[in-house]
Regions:
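Domain-level signal for Mg2+-assisted phosphodiester chemistry and nucleotide/NA-binding surfaces
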Residues: 1-105
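Generic preference for flexible, low-structure residues
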Residues: 19-23, 27, 77-79, 154, ...
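Low-complexity, acidic/Ser/Thr- and charged residue-rich accessory regions of DNA metabolism proteins
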Residues: 40, 263-268, 273-327
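Extended two-metal-dependent nuclease catalytic cores across DNA- and RNA-processing enzymes
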Residues: 84-288
Length: 327
């Protein structure tokens, strides 16, 4: 089995705890202090090692990191509330993030960061590589439940965001992944398409993505999903193109929610582009990076370049990975 970490989630999760040790202090100054910075990085390593040790037979570990998203080019108000106000320590925060990335690369872990790609985009591409190309099991470690939309029979998600640890998988693969569930965690089977519908129809306040219909909430969504076919064979798949997917959802949603089809289609098409992690989205982009590559080309190039570069072969402990004894 391989493990794929959401690097930005791990970094923010650890920092949220680390920062509580310095309440009332200038966090920029704290992060500039070499000794305190190393304490923070050691805590990141401890979290990483503990997670890997929770699973057996881990072959490769990949960590993905965000860059400035292509979605801002398409939707300038993307994540408006999150990006318009920066904390005073933001520059130091990013410097330490860069240092952590360099540290992981130096240790032989595969680190993936591609211009224009968010971690979500890279998690999808790496899931295709491990799950489809290699036909190997992949466990994605993130607190972002939206990523469950990319689960397959051999790609699952481990949410370590709280004391209530959960390993998510598709319903048809639960009998396999139940043997991978670490002690103290719960196995939860979820249909990936239902996760996508949640994002597309209800939007995402944290990303400033609107819902398709005002007042249409989670309970209404559950009722809508109950009207859909239960047989996966007649449902859209990851191979479905953008318009057929939008049309499939809009046709059924407009009837159920009594929304004009054209109105529903326009909003659903927009939300699909913003939230769906699928090849049809990337194939439809006009984004080009500094090397004149499309986003999809750039991500595939990164996977091809790094897929055989994994070198770490020691124990997943602070002493072995960080290179210094625990005091």
């Amino acid at each position: 089995m391989n493990i794929l970490f959401d690097g930005n989630f791990a970094f923010h999760k650890t920092f949220s705890v680390f920062s509580t040790y310095y309440k009332g202090q200038d966090l920029g100054e704290v992060l500039r202090d070499p000794e305190k910075k190393q304490v923070f990085i050691r805590k990141l390593v401890i979290e990483l090692c503990h997670t890997v040790r929770s699973f057996d037979d881990v072959e490769k570990v990949v960590v993905v990191f965000d860059t400035h998203s292509w979605r801002y080019n398409f939707y300038p108000d993307y994540k408006y509330a999150l990006t318009r106000i920066r904390d005073d320590y933001y520059k130091e925060f990013i410097r330490v993030l860069d240092d952590f990335e360099a540290f992981l690369r130096n240790k032989g872990v595969i680190v993936s960061r591609v211009e224009g790609a968010e971690g979500d985009d890279l998690m999808y591409i790496w899931s295709v590589y491990f799950g489809v190309v290699c036909n190997e099991e992949l466990l994605i470690v993130t607190g972002d439940s939206d990523i469950r939309q990319i689960m397959t029979s051999n790609v699952a998600l481990f949410n370590n965001n709280s004391k209530n640890l959960k390993l998510y998988c598709t319903p048809e693969s639960a009998s396999v992944w139940r043997y991978r569930v670490p002690e103290g965690a719960e196995l939860v089977a979820v249909r990936p398409f239902d996760v996508l519908l949640y994002k597309v129809l209800l939007g995402d306040k944290s990303d400033n993505i609107p819902s398709v219909k005002r007042g249409f909430g989670e309970k209404a969504l559950e009722k809508f999903i109950a009207t859909l076919p239960a047989d996966p064979a007649v449902m859209p798949t990851v191979e479905t193109q953008m318009f057929p997917m939008a049309d499939w959802i809009a046709t059924r949603f407009s009837d159920f929610a009594r929304v004009p089809y054209e109105e529903a289609l326009e909003k659903i098409n927009f939300n699909l582009k913003m939230t769906w992690l699928g090849l049809s989205v990337y194939n439809d982009l006009d984004y080009v990076n500094a090397n004149h590559q499309s986003l999809l080309e750039a991500m595939l190039t990164d996977v091809e370049r790094q897929k055989n570069t994994y070198k770490y072969n020691k124990e997943w402990t602070l002493e072995s990975f960080y290179g210094m004894p625990i005091k």
